[in-house]
Amino acid sequence: MKSQTKNTPITGDEIRKEFLNFYHEKLHKIIPSASLIPDDPTVMLTIAGMLPFKPVFLGLKERPSKRATSSQKCIRTNDIENVGVTARHHTFFEMLGNFSFGDYFKKEAIEWAWELVTDIYGLSAENIIVSVFHEDDDSVKIWKEDIGIHPKRIIKLGEKDNFWSSGKTGPCGPCSELYFDFKPEKGVQNIDLEDGDRFIEFYNLVFMQYNRDPDGQLTDLKYKNIDTGMGLERMAQILQKKKNNYETDLIFPIIQKASEISKIDYYSSGERTKISLKIIGDHIRAVIHLISDGVIASNLGRGYILRRLIRRMVRHGRLLGLKNEFLSKLASVGIKLMQENYPDLKNNCDHILSEIKIEEIRFRETLERGEKLLDELISSGQKMITGFKAFELYDTYGFPLELTEEIAQENNIGVDVKGFDKEMSAQKERAKAASQIIDLTLEGSLEREIDLFDKTLFNGYDSLDSDAEIKGIFLESTLVKQASEGQKVLIVLDQTSFYGESGGQVGDIGTILSNDLEVVVDNVIRKKNVFLHYGIVKKGILSLGQKVKTKVNDLARAKAAANHTATHLLQSALKVVVNESVGQKGSLVAFNKLRFDFNSSKPITKDQIFKVETLVNSWILENHSLNIKNMAKSEALERGAVAMFGEKYDDEVRVVDVPSVSMELCGGTHVKTTSELGCFKIISEEGISAGVRRIEALSGQSAFEYFSDKNSLVSQLCDLLKANPNQLLDRVNSLQSELINKNKEIQKMKDEIAYFKYSSLSSSANKVGLFSLIISQLDGLDGNSLQSAALDLTSKLGDKSVVILGGIPDKENRKLLFVVSFGEDLVKRGMHAGKLINDISRICSGGGGGKPNFAQAGAKDIDKLNDALEYARKDLRTKLHSYSDK
């Protein structure tokens, strides 16, 4: 590697900044990192830098510009067992990338990549090896002739290593990867890029030039694209000359904090301890970003990934001897490390720390219950913990085998690991058979268990009641045979009348009943066509195979149905009033309100909101009947049915049609006629992200209650202001005018008081050489009055004057105000009021700023006021004397 110069980026932040700036100068638009929760429904998390641009590459979305560059936060958990073990595996990482959408291609991509890594990052050509697709002669030629790389440093590889595709069909193309050689002294004979101790791949250039059809044939794309990715953590390891990514400034401060808390020295620790520290250092970064992006710990999907990461950290914390809550302390370090580049972390800091604490405490309680069982086994005098009991600890209490072994060893007893493995294998066999109940494990996921169940038949469109059979019971994340009174359960049925949360609509509420059984259902979620009923057993015993009846709360269903139909009418009205291109970006259909997110480059005006409301209410009054039927998706789209962008639909779809008003693909519940909505009211409209607006609205009973509350408020205002409703506006305008006049009178009185307080100061100004100096405390004046006083005194004393005033406007609030005013002569000599006031206010734990001739500041510590003014007096006397002597 070339020797580092003072301009060579060395910190992780500098590496990121230089990458983005480099490509920005090459006319790339800098795109902020997208959320870890992708718009793409085919993936659970953002796993690559190109994922936010996938719709652009597929031609489904307009390109943000011809060229783009980004630093994208990503999470991958497919190799979680390697995290902390290898030098470079992570769950959370940042991918630096530059992209071309039909603009430049191989030559520019390769030349710029080389310029970046050699000129900007200072890497030596002797440390770089490149790989290319063995049939990509164009890239080989560019590397040889244009870049000048020695042929032996160009390694040709097959399709497995150097040909990228988005799937079995679609855009694809060869790629060229840059590797860093940590041991160039070994030469370029017989290079093995799989040698992880010697080589690390750090920059991948993908040349998307083909489209692969279902038969595997490649045809040229109309537009050739570039997609590149550079791992920030890997480049930091290279430039900071570290043994692994974990010891870079991106992660190591977290590891240091964990070492401090656990009183363990990282460098002198054994490998097992280092692995635990590195796992914690990695996982905490993933966790804070997941929570900040809106993920909530649960047993499903993204929520399970979050929960799994937190529990792994708690487990490895236990291995480090950390028996008390510690994760929030590490999260605080992680947030401080990354908040400059990800401001949302700072904004969501309290929420992040709170969620981590709650989840850690919850899991520690589970661990404590497991420890009690373990203590009983130890105190029983047994010399060996059986495999069955070890598996029970693991399976029921989430107790890692390693922790069981550690505690057993401390008490001089053994653990039947082979028996444990046998129980684990038996569980896997039961899962494969899918005919017996299995337990959820700490490292397992409810998402996987759903595959054990057949599709739930939903028969709730036409009836709110249904006969059903209990097919699965979950109790505290474990599949069980029975549940009793007072226990919270998750129930799977063979068929149900409960609507499962999907398409933005909340799940139904109600009851599941049998002879002596009552389960109150408070939520239903649909996953992979399996309906999960959440509730509590109010009476009786719930058993597998039990025959039951489902009974949906009809009032709640009616409210949700009304709000769902209202959402369809709202979208149609927005298309009419705002723009035909308005499309749904998200929605919530709840019992008490609806929320609709849609694309719009600017806010909706008050006039447009009024027109939308009026149009929706006119459709309600017209009493349109809804026609709902199933048909082929192609037919529905040909008829003009609206489909949500990015949503996946079956070949047969359900179409909800309000004739001449709205037609959408939708699986939700709806009213029979629009008049059932009663009325419609928009209660808010706001922007939630770039190009996306959000409307919240009410219909039916909720809308009537809203109007009733407003009417009650108007009545109260009429009583207070002694006016009838028609006079309210005039009365408020009159009061506002009176208030303005009174405030003017008050300000005039304040100015007179201020003048009385400061008028005598001009005659008592101190002479310091050629200059007049006033430094004084004036209490009881607000900011405006203090400013007027300083400017007035400066005007009276002339160009060679300095006025510094500090005071306490209101002693009850315990705040300080400062103002500094310089005459023109001092400004010409280079004096700056803004700089001086910063120095003064800092003494009192404050801050401020301003122009060279005038500045103001606020501060908190009123006890330091005299110290601040004395500092100013000494500082200015020295400076003014020096100016007078010249």
Curated annotation (Swiss-Prot):
Cofactor note: Binds 1 zinc ion per subunit.
Record has Zinc as a keyword: yes
Protein's UniProt name: Alanine--tRNA ligase
Positions with a binding annotation for Zn(2+): 564, 568, 666, 670
UniProt-listed GO biological process terms: alanyl-tRNA aminoacylation
GO MF annotation: an example: zinc ion binding
Localization per record: Cytoplasm
Cofactor list: Zn(2+)
InterPro entries xref list: aa-tRNA-synth_II/BPL/LPL, Ala-tRNA-lgiase_IIc, Ala-tRNA-ligase_IIc_anticod-bd, Ala-tRNA-synth_IIc_core, Ala-tRNA-synth_IIc_N, Ala-tRNA_ligase, Ala_tRNA_ligase_euk/bac, DHHA1_dom
Coiled coil: none
Protein family according to the UniProt entry: Belongs to the class-II aminoacyl-tRNA synthetase family.
SUPFAM superfamilies: Class II aaRS and biotin synthetases (SSF55681), Putative anticodon-binding domain of alanyl-tRNA synthetase (AlaRS) (SSF101353), ThrRS/AlaRS common domain (SSF55186), Translation proteins (SSF50447)
Domain notes: Consists of three domains; the N-terminal catalytic domain, the editing domain and the C-terminal C-Ala domain. The editing domain removes incorrectly charged amino acids, while the C-Ala domain, along with tRNA(Ala), serves as a bridge to cooperatively bring together the editing and aminoacylation centers thus stimulating deacylation of misacylated tRNAs.
Matches recorded under PROSITE patterns: AA_TRNA_LIGASE_II_ALA
Function of the protein: Catalyzes the attachment of alanine to tRNA(Ala) in a two-step reaction: alanine is first activated by ATP to form Ala-AMP and then transferred to the acceptor end of tRNA(Ala). Also edits incorrectly charged Ser-tRNA(Ala) and Gly-tRNA(Ala) via its editing domain.
Catalysed reaction, written as an equation: tRNA(Ala) + L-alanine + ATP = L-alanyl-tRNA(Ala) + AMP + diphosphate
Superkingdom as given in the UniProt entry: Bacteria
GO cellular component: cytosol
Assigned EC number: 6.1.1.7
Location (main, coarse): cytoplasm
Alphabetic keyword roster: Aminoacyl-tRNA synthetase, ATP-binding, Cytoplasm, Ligase, Metal-binding, Nucleotide-binding, Protein biosynthesis, RNA-binding, tRNA-binding, Zinc
